[in-house]
Amino acid sequence: MDINELSPSEVFSYFQEICAIPHGSGNTGMIADYCLDFAKLHGLKARKDTSDNVVIFKAGSSGYEDCEPVILQGHLDMVCEKEPGCDIDMSVQSIKACTDGKMVWADGTTLGADDGIAVAFILAVLASDTIAHPPIQAVLTSDEEIGMLGARDLDTSDLTAKRLINIDSESEGILYVSLSLIH
């Protein structure tokens, strides 16, 4: 079975594209450029900084234009590990995502679902013309796996959202909710 046959197909299509781009920690330039190209293709305002953080802005859908914006956040980098004997150079070669329809895994390497699947979900939401949503500020940070370096360098001067949905978790089926009061 091909990964593009999984549902939601838009998400897994983006995830397969992400797997084709080397994006280990410290090597996020190509995935950041991919996200910028995505924004341009969809007519969305976007920016990339010197740390390879990418921010993409999408106006609210019809009826939601004046709602408070929300940040959708994920990180662009992945932990690059491989099985003994695997000759893939993860700094320049693609990850081969495999599926049996129930599980997704990589052939000989880590998959990069942390946090590539979050980036794929965010891109699918940004690309959709059918999902009702408030204004979205998509924040895609770099080098989370090696100390949240991108988040530390993120320019937040044009981010106006008071709510953030971080799509990254250690446990399947667990939702974490937290609140930080900013004055």
Language-model-derived ranges and their functions:
Residues 51-55, 145-147, 172:
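Short acidic loop-to-helix transition motifs that present clustered carboxylates
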Residues 155-176:
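A glycine-rich helix N-cap at a beta->alpha junction
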Residues 29, 148, 165:
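Metal-dependent catalytic neighborhoods of phosphoester/phosphodiester hydrolases
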Residues 180:
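Glycine-rich active-site loop/lid that clamps phosphate-bearing ligands
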Residues 183:
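Conserved small/polar residues in nucleotide/adenosyl-binding loops
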Residues 2-102:
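Acidic/His- and Gly-rich active-site-bordering loop/insert found
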Residues 64-135, 140, 145-146, 151-162:
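Active-site metal-coordination/substrate-binding segment of hydrolases
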